[in-house]
Amino acid sequence: VLIMDVKKRANILIDWINNYCDSASYKPKSLVVGISGGIDSSVVSTLCANTGRKTIVLTMPIKQIKSQHDLSLSHAKWLKEKYSNVEHHLIEMDKIFNSFSDVLNKFDHEHGYANSRARLRMATLYQVAAANSGIVVGTGNKVEDFGVGFYTKYGDGGVDISPIADCTKSQVWERGRHLGISDDIIDTPPTDGLW
């Protein structure tokens, strides 16, 4: 793939986000993205930062593997250092999830709780967006989310816009390299972040 093509494609996505915000009847003042330490959320958050609009990135660990959490914190730090329009907030969600599962202990179901983690994150993203006159920007790609349907309904699928919805995983990796995403993130095998 030619470098110019990758750059042009990234700019098309950046312009698309800006055009969406400019043409929406509700004029969003911020873009809110949950970051996991994976390539999809890293690319989307970097595209958002490149719009020049206020970009709020949230790390929301719930029983998360330390290496994934470390990658998300590293990416957030990189974004803040590179883009003056980026804010990062670490929202520890273990207590919220523990309270949720304690209240519902007689309805214990591992898969249900895994999906509930994604739904708690979605509710958090929308609360932050509401408090900042923003929109929630999704991180789903063409193959996993919009092809196979590998997402949590009303969880990570609950977003306002999905800039990489038409990108294959290979294209997401290409954009990540072009945008300067850390090799540690690019080389990490994808996970769903649910377990």
Each predicted region: which residue ranges?
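Catalytic subdomain that performs nucleotidyl-dependent activation
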Residues: 135-195
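ATP-dependent adenylation/nucleotidyltransferase module used to activate substrates
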Residues: 1-150
